Amino acid sequence: MSNLKNNLTWVEINKASLINNIRLFRGLIGRKTILAPCVKANAYGHDMVKTAKIALAAGADWLNVNAVFEAVELRKAGIKSPIYIMGYVMKKDIADAVRLNCRLVAYNKETIAELGKATKRLHKKAIIHLKIETGNNRQGILMGNLMDFVEYVKKFPQITIEGISTHFANIEDISVSEAKRFLKNKNSEKSFQLAAYPLFQLENFRHAIALLKNAGINVPIRHCANSAATMLFPETHFDMVRPGIAFYGLWPSEETKVAFQKMHKGAKLMPVLSWRTRIAQIKNVSAGSYIGYGCTYRAKKNMKIAILPIGYYDGFDRGFSNKGYVLIRGKRAKICGRVCMNITMVDVTDIPSARVEDTATILGKDGREEITADELAQIAGTINYEITTRINEKIPRIVI
């Protein structure tokens, strides 16, 4: 903890919490299923390299990223585990992905053609995972085009189809009991259709697997489970799971949280990330004075405010203006006025012991109080994913 004293604004990564979450997922899937956490987008704001190293040491098997530059960063950090690139790889970057021994998602013939050229040029084999369109309508091979796509891949003997995958559209938003009831009753009401949509997608995915199997093509690694699927639906685990937000101790949704806690008494996710800054100034403000840009906050009485050196440049959403709180000396201090690019003002009238360079907690615990990513997301009108992912990468991440 000593190195924290040297930082003006910083993010803490709790190693014990991350290990807890890793063990929780391992307990859910068993030893034979590949545990492949998503560390894309700077590990959802948690620091990709530091998080990846902790995860692998604690029992994760693979790492999932979105782009080649992320894979480059991991390899430069000495990480040798399998890396699966889930996002589109530009033609100019395909050779780099092959050199790095990465698995690539595949759904375009253009990618396959360029991959074929790269394997010849480099005298290396390439490994791909087919992405199947089952109902999310993002990237993926349409079911009717699957066999034609596979036949095209066969033209390139240096390319191996190792995996087949898909991605759910709303599995984190559904009620497990409703979904199960739909399967039994085949009810046509809209709410039940939406509840069963992940299961509709799962049936499509199984159909794709069967098409390949009937054609004599055995794909060894089948995967479709994100955080919610891994936690609630064992039938989605197949050979590999890809937890994302829950790996970092945050719930994909309230529905997932409620259902999981009913199914697994005593098991819990532990948030990994805390975000803190320091008071830069404390000043008195007279009743009737305005605070901040736009004069959106007017002091109703004499008050004391603290100036914090943090703003929307750092990833602290402007939507927190006049709404959000920070924690100072274990108490809530309300934001006064607009969140600025580099500065935020908070009311410390009722925290008389507050001093310059005291810690202000943006996200996390301070004493008995806590500000969660879900609370911040609700204020900003977004999701917890965005709250942590948008924290500026230049802010130091410190493992504690």
Name the predicted role of every residue range.
Residues 2-15, 19, 69-70, 89, ...:
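Active-site anion/phosphate-binding pocket segments in diverse small-molecule metabolic enzymes
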Residues 2-5, 9-15, 19, 27, ...:
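Active-site-proximal beta-alpha core segment in soluble small-molecule metabolic enzymes
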